[in-house]
Amino acid sequence: MKAEAKDAAALAPMVKRLWPEHDLQALVRILTEYIASPESAVFACREGDRFVGAALCCLRHDYVEGCQTSPVGYLEGIYMEEDCRKTGLARTLLGQCEQWAKEMGCREFASDCELTNETSLAFHLSLGFTEENRIICFKKTL
């Protein structure tokens, strides 16, 4: 299902397990912005009255590794509760993101993960993604 603004607060604690560096209020704000923007979407799945998974996707107009077109649909994050992994629900969420991207005019869909996140790498490869590059990012304070 496509998440609505009223779902942001209920989704935030689960999404915090994906991005623990963010506080809950920041995640509610991020989710609310993603839900409201025509350039992004949040899809979620429930079991009974609890959310068990969520996927955040957006349109990227900048360069995306390995892609030749613009905009590119981009999976910013996907999370499934432990007891719902390997059930096909994440595949369904990804499919909803991909369909949304097609409807937005995209011909390519991309994602990323940390170099050390072997679980995410296996997930992406199992769902038809191909690895395009490995990078280490740098910064310095000016």
Regions found by a protein language model. Give the residues of each.
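Conserved GNAT acetyl-CoA-binding A-motif
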Residues: 94, 101-113
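Conserved acetyl-CoA-binding loop-helix of GNAT-fold acetyltransferases
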Residues: 80, 86-99, 122-126
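Conserved beta-strand-loop-alpha-helix junction that forms the acyl-donor binding cleft
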Residues: 110-120, 139
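Conserved acetyl-CoA binding element of GNAT-fold acetyltransferases
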Residues: 68-82, 136-137
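Helix-loop element at the rim of GNAT/NAT acetyltransferase active sites that forms part
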Residues: 12-26
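Conserved beta-strand in the GNAT
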Residues: 44, 50-59, 74, 79
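A short beta-loop-alpha structural element at the N-terminal edge
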Residues: 1-11
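Active-site rim helix/loop that mediates acceptor-substrate recognition in acyltransferases
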Residues: 23-46, 56
